[in-house]
Amino acid sequence: FRRSWLDALSAPGLAIYNKIQKKNGEKFSARYAFTDLNLKVNHHINDRSQAYVNFYFGQDFLKGGSSEFSVGDDITPFENKDFGKMRWGNIALSSGWSYVFNNKMFGTVTLAYSHYQSKLKQETSQYYGTEGDKDYSSRFIETSTRNGINDFGVHANFDYIPTPAHHIRYGTDYLYHRFSPEYIEEKTSENLSPTKRTTGDERLSANELAVFAEDDWAISSIVRVNAGLRLNMYNIQKKTYVSLDPRLSVRFLLTRNLSLKTSYAQMNQYVHQISESYMSLPTDMWMPVSKKLKPLESDQVSVGAYYNLHKDYSFSVEGYHKWMNHLLDYKDGYNFLPSFVGWEEKLAAGKGWAYGAEFIARKETGRITGWIGYGLMWSDRQFDEINNGKRFPAKYDNRHKLNIVANWKINEKLELTGSWTFMTGNRVTVAFENYEDLGLTPVPPLLPEGGLDYFTERNNVRLPAYHRLDLGINIYRPKKNGHLGIWNISVYNAYCQMNPITIHKRSWINYSHYFETLSLLPIIPSISYTYKF
């Protein structure tokens, strides 16, 4: 079980800050909390079989916003509010049974259920004057978006080892999907005249069946081959997609410590992850394929070299290139489409490329272990209906990425952990020009929020570099009955780097406009407890 305490620890400080800022006509709201619960129970039935049950619950909540209001009796009362709430989480439950048939074959059958849902609510409100006066004006907009998916699955996997040179794996998977692609509720009020409309709320069911097999074959002491094939069948809206996914990797052991590996893999994916281009949030939408939207197809090749130095250190360098087809993304200006337009009509299909190289160095023995990894990467997209058909960088076109991870086992009861992450910032789409509505006469300090934004290119701005330090301590508490309790105290983003997730335009009462970054996650302490029995 793990729970963050940032919301409880920061509440008094935020209250004091808002009390100070009240005289300046400002108020801020911020809250982030997450809860994780993991439960795993294994039961050893006999020497040949065992059963297990896994349960996971994860829930995140994020709220932030600000308000500006009049101070004093000598000016006309006004208030501008802008708040957002996000909630997302997973529930997963699985139960399995493993059985050893003989010394050459064993298998596992698993039943699984998972549920994911994300909710996003944005609320803006403004008023100027005193209600009842002829100059009084007000506006309120609240938009709620919901997306979710439920999966029920049965999996059967078998391992067969006929000889020391062959390890054959095969099996079958069945999944029943229940999608809620998009539900939008919008409440508006203009000068106390409320309206409400909802769109979406469509439920889609899909059936996915797959059979697969692979063989890990040591042809000789130098050459080892892993070959696999997966047959997929996916049915939705009375439409059935069939695909064949082959993969092949070959390893050459040049010396006892040096090896080369090359691989090829083809994949078809039947659920698309769609994200807004103007910010990076964990509440991206999960959309299914349909009669109109085809499965994502990808082909990837890679080649790498791997070197072991004694038993303590290992080094690797690997290059890859990935081609993607039938990628989905929101069309330009999709948010201006009429409310009755379905979720499929907001999406465009295109292609993409991802390529780069990764370098990793590991220390795997001793009291201090860890690894350092660096990646140099490119990722591009191209859609006929986006960016005037021109190729553009993907949202996650992070050119450089560096990870440093270290673990120090002080003794059998105490362990320290640390990791530092650095990467080039994500890309977002920002409009640098706005054409205001003709004839609009705003009354200070209410500013015109309408007009038409002009976007020159998709993902035209790169956010500042992302970096953070995570620290943790594990305290092991052995029990007399052989059970083990583990306390974990960790700090996410230890030096409180406020990494931006978007850039947005702000206005002030003199009608000047400026851009500012929005950051969400500061330092987050958390405590977890694990009990093994």
Where are these regions (language model features)?
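Outer membrane beta-barrel strand-and-loop segments of large Gram-negative receptors
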Residues: 151-153, 199-204, 210, 290, ...
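Transmembrane beta-barrel strands of outer-membrane/channel proteins
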Residues: 1-3, 53-59, 109-115, 170-176, ...
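Surface-exposed extracellular loop regions of Gram-negative outer-membrane beta-barrel proteins
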Residues: 117, 185-186, 257-301, 321-344, ...
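Periplasmic-side early beta-strands and strand-to-turn transitions of outer-membrane beta-barrels
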Residues: 1-86, 326
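Face-selective signature of the C-terminal outer-membrane beta-barrel domain
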Residues: 42-60, 84-238, 253, 316, ...
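Structural signature of Gram-negative outer-membrane beta-barrels, strongest in the C-terminal barrel
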Residues: 149-151, 161-167, 173, 200-324, ...
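C-terminal beta-signal and adjacent terminal beta-strands/loops
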Residues: 4-9, 413, 422-449, 464-470, ...
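Gram-negative outer-membrane beta-barrel transporters
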Residues: 321-323, 341-432
